[in-house]
């Protein structure tokens, strides 16, 4: 019998590009974009207060794992810039991991330590690690945006050859 689907919630800049790249990963069964980590209930694009633009990911743990998702997340956005990705500046575009349980928190903290130790980014990781709260689904026009507009705006790119080594003594 297959394992139950697991959930991950990540923020790393504009949600269009994050969704388009993460949705393609083996084991990812569904994605949706929205707002989380902030102060406004029923957040919308025009009124999302201090929320981050985020992506909710459902994945099959028999086909991929949380660590693999995080490694890809750290490859496709710059986790060393605070409240910014490319031309997008502001709290909405911060880097954050919203964990659903203590195991995800531990994996997130270990992965961040590995990213910092790797020297793959020019500065230390500023990614926030917070418990997941309400996730407000974005409007339909934001869902699957780059599927509908393949030449639309994105500041997220896979970096060929980017491989995250585990720190010496880490569980990786």
Swiss-Prot record:
UniProt catalytic activity: L-methionyl-[protein] + [thioredoxin]-disulfide + H2O = L-methionyl-(S)-S-oxide-[protein] + [thioredoxin]-dithiol; [thioredoxin]-disulfide + L-methionine + H2O = L-methionine (S)-S-oxide + [thioredoxin]-dithiol
Gene Ontology molecular function terms on file: L-methionine-(S)-S-oxide reductase activity; peptide-methionine (S)-S-oxide reductase activity
Pfam family, any one: PMSR
Active-site annotation: 14
InterPro entries per UniProt: Met_Sox_Rdtase_MsrA_dom, Met_Sox_Rdtase_MsrA_sf
UniProt keyword annotations, A-Z: Oxidoreductase
Any Gene Ontology CC annotation: cytoplasm
Catalytic activity, EC: 1.8.4.11
EC class: oxidoreductase
The UniProt record lists the keyword Oxidoreductase: yes
A GO biological process held by the record: protein modification process
Role description: Has an important function as a repair enzyme for proteins that have been inactivated by oxidation. Catalyzes the reversible oxidation-reduction of methionine sulfoxide in proteins to methionine.
Family: Belongs to the MsrA Met sulfoxide reductase family.
Protein name per Swiss-Prot or TrEMBL: Peptide methionine sulfoxide reductase MsrA
Source taxonomy: Bacteria, Bacillati, Actinomycetota, Actinomycetes, Kitasatosporales
Name of the gene: msrA
């Amino acid at each position: 019998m297959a394992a139950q689907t697991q959930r991950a919630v990540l923020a790393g800049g504009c949600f269009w590009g994050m969704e388009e790249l993460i949705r393609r990963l083996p084991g990812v069964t569904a994605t949706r974009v929205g707002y989380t980590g902030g102060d406004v209930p029923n957040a919308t694009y025009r009124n999302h207060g201090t929320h981050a633009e985020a992506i909710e990911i459902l994945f099959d743990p028999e086909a991929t794992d949380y660590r693999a998702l995080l490694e890809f997340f750290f490859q496709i956005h710059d986790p060393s810039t605070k409240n910014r990705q490319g031309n997008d500046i502001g709290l909405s575009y911060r880097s954050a991991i919203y964990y659903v349980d203590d195991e995800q928190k531990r994996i997130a903290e270990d992965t961040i330590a590995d990213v910092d130790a790797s020297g793959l980014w020019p500065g230390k990781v500023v990614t926030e690690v917070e418990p997941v709260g309400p996730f407000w689904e974005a409007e339909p026009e934001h869902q699957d945006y780059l599927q509908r507009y393949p030449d639309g705006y994105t500041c997220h790119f896979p970096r060929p050859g980017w491989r995250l080594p585990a720190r010496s003594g880490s569980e990786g």
